[in-house]
């Protein structure tokens, strides 16, 4: 599956300079960082969460894991991971596990971990398990201008 059409449209409509980088097929974000020869701190991964208020996309570095309890306390919400059928339905032009870390491109409220806001370059899934999108840090911060942000992750064990 090539780059998500919706993602491409979103980036193009905003005039963002980006490049699509192919890599060998991977199943985890840490594998992707290794295959693409990039620091896991610069690979943004998405985690789709939900509760009675709706969906929320949490974006954090591949080198970190979400601290769900902390996030729930900060937001005053009772969040859980979205199910695979929900991912398939919500991201029709993406493979499961390769959802781009740009929730707003898909009409989903987004929360970004503060650790990503200082990076010079950011990479994220293009919608498949074989391509990454690369943008510079300033462009990424502009894309995230309307996103909430906070500290809700811990280093991978």
Where are these regions (language model features)?
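Extended, low-hydrophobicity, polar/charged segments
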Residues: 1-157
């Amino acid at each position: 599956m090539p780059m998500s059409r919706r993602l491409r449209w979103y980036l193009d409509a905003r005039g963002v300079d980006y490049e699509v980088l192919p890599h060998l097929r991977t199943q985890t974000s840490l594998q992707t960082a290794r295959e693409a020869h990039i620091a896991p701190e610069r690979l943004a991964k998405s985690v789709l969460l939900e509760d009675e208020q709706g969906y929320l996309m949490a974006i954090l570095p591949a080198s970190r894991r979400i601290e769900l309890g902390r996030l729930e306390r900060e937001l005053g919400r009772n969040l859980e991971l979205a199910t695979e059928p929900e991912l398939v339905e919500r991201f029709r032009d993406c493979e499961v596990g390769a959802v781009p870390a740009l929730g707003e491109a898909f009409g989903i409220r987004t929360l970004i971990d503060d650790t990503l806001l200082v990076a010079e370059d950011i990479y994220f899934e293009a919608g498949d398990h074989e391509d990454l999108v690369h943008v510079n840090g300033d462009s990424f911060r502009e894309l995230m201008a309307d996103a909430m942000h906070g500290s809700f992750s811990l280093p991978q064990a």
